[in-house]
Amino acid sequence: TGGCRRLRLVPGARGGGAGEAGTDTEEAAVSADRPEPKPYRAAEKPFTEGELAYWGASGITVEVLRRYGTVSLAEYRGETREGKAFGFSSTPAEPMFGYRGKWGVKVYRPMSEVRFVYGGHTGDNYCFGLEQLPSKGDLLFLTGGEKDVLTLAAHGFHAICFNSETSVIPAKTVRKLVYRFKHIVLLYDTDKTGLECSEKHRAQLAEYGVKRLVLPLPGTKAEKDVTDYFKAGHTREELMGLFLSCSTRCTGTRWRC
């Protein structure tokens, strides 16, 4: 309903790449309707001071970026599903980053019109942050995006995300995580789409005890997610307080705030 629907893999007009610092790699970019991926090429570079300041605004450090395989990309070249070549280059005004994984890379261009580009087979099992989770833990947040995962990690929380808030959350993944974490909590954006999707996912995953926490943010473009929450000066203790407050007031599958 509304903006909350299953997200298809983006058409071949979007692709991505991965590689070691200062090197080029040639892998394959995803096509939405063909199993055979398209070729792509990407070049990494060192983070600039401006790029580190962008991540650092919500507390994300170089160590966190490194731990989660997040890199700075200088250039990306790929093909559309029709075989037409295209590419992007990083600039100070339009930086380009990559979230690397065993499957490939998801390119993130926060200041650009085309913000996300996929390279490799993301598939329905894409889950950012899963490999960094401990074998056991108390609290796990399910967020709407990679940057939110990084922000939460920078503040000492465990978190993962799927392709987007509108993606279907694989029940098999949650089923495994239930045995590893005491609390699994949806922490999505507070705009219309985020609220609709977090409630839909909460209902779909109620049998696993998944809960929902809504941040005290207005839902505007500048104030809608946990990254904005920490950028505004809120602390780890405040977020933990919100969680504890909700868990004290509400119990069972109807636990939501």
Model-derived regions: residue spans:
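Short, acidic/turn-prone active-site loops that include or flank metal/cofactor-
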Residues: 163-168, 189-190, 217-219
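Short, aromatic/basic amphipathic alpha-helical patches
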Residues: 174, 196-208
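A generic structural motif
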Residues: 211-221
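Acidic beta-strand-to-loop metal/phosphate-binding motif
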Residues: 140-142, 181-193, 216
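TOPRIM metal-binding catalytic domain and adjacent DNA-binding surface shared by DnaG-type primases
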Residues: 4-103, 118-138, 242-257
